[in-house]
Amino acid sequence: NKFPGLGRTGFGETVTLPSGQVVSAYDAKYATYLKLFTGEMFKAYESACIAKGTVQNRTLRNGKAAQFIFTGRMTADYHVPGTPILGSGDPPVAEKIIVMDDLLVSSAFLYDLDETLAHYSLRSEISKKIGHALAEAYDKKIFRVIAKSARTAHPITASPGPEPGGSVIKLGAGNEFNAQALVDAFFEAASILDEKNVPSAGRTAVLSPRQYYALISQVDTNILNRDYGNTQGNLNSGEGLYEIAGISIRRSNNLPFMAGTVGRVDGENNDYSGDFAAHCGLIYQRDAAAVVQGIGPQIQTTGGDVKTMYQGDLIVGRLAMGADWLNPAAAIELQAA
């Protein structure tokens, strides 16, 4: 026993930890399990969530929405002697408001008897499932709004604009897994982003797993750069991060890949709906979309009274966030059309 005598204490009694802290016998007995569970949930969330960090992020404090400001290009003119410089009274400025969706939860009830009879760690498995569920919802929202960003005109239209909007690259019908078509799309995307003066740092491509492996298995290594791994075994296994034309390549099952029409869901305060029948990938820079987050991924469990009444623990993972397009110029959608 980690704490001598703990196994003989009753509910409501206390024990003194080696640190000198006095806690309830129940808290001391189960503290390690809950910490392990929380850690497993965060680990699973972070490993499954690939969109995190590839777009702009804001944490909300005492607010329900975040404001983002766009600025357009300005002109330069020659000064005429004797005339005042008054400046532009209508600078090219626009705003984008991104609100938070309703609270997103993933939960499970862990019955004590099930945990006792199982020959594996139920808490560990459940923690991973909760983490994956939150990460999947997070990624799906972001990838949809990036696709919508690629189809959106820039909000600043004033002179000397309009500013460039999003772009769609069509691979051709049935070419979603064609390696050469994908390579051509990468170089076309790099050219488009350069022509729009989009920063080269933070450029990312997201493909389906089948596209990803078709690409890295068929493309010449002179075109495909690897961040690490120098053997053919690394290439065949898909280990490492790969780049084409300075664009980092990732794979995900959370793209709206040839998904058809995706409707709105109750609780979503941003619009993630759209027709994704021809969608087959994304290439974007981090300014293409933004995420606002009010509550980061957290874990909650019921207390001792509930455990006694129901002979188990209700375990809840929660996340409060919202996402929407930000700068359309930084978003490119690949379509099999």
Q: Locations of the language-model features?
A:
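Structured, hydrophobic secondary-structure cores that serve as assembly/anchoring elements
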Residues: 57, 65-67, 72-73, 86-87, ...
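Sequence/fold signature of self-assembling virion shell proteins
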Residues: 1-52, 57-75, 94-99, 165-181, ...
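Short, charged, low-complexity loops and linkers
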Residues: 23-25, 84-89
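Short, polar/proline-rich extracytoplasmic segments that appear immediately after membrane translocation
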Residues: 89-90, 147
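Short, glycine/acidic-enriched capping/hinge loops at junctions between secondary-structure elements
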Residues: 78-84, 327-328
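Alpha-helical scaffold segments that mediate packing/assembly in large oligomeric complexes
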Residues: 115-195, 333-337
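Conserved loop-to-helix interface motifs that mediate assembly, gating, or partner/ligand docking
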Residues: 148, 152, 204, 214-218, ...
